[in-house]
């Protein structure tokens, strides 16, 4: 995909109805992409087996995007080649009452993968800081003072 064709350069008014949103303009061949995806899924499965056998590290995939950007679909389709026994998916939504009793990284630490395993984070702790401030949850959520500082 050629990202430049979707980038607004700021030289004038931004008219969303005039911006191209269709990848067909880039000459993308869906059949080639599907074939490559199938090939990559097979490679991912083999790599996961080797990663598990090695057992020295854990691996985290972080998917960070706006709502309805396709994070769940990416997990469902792109990660479908992985063995589900070695993968844990965690969605970080607004902190619940239990999570509010701990520091802001507690729930992330809880979701870290074991050695040889893979964790997929739907959103990340970066957004966690933003959500807490946006919804004014700082009083009940233990965050480092430097995180709450404003410029």
Kindly give the residue locations of the regions a language model identified:
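Glycine-rich phosphate-binding loop of ATP-dependent small-molecule kinases
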Residues: 1-151
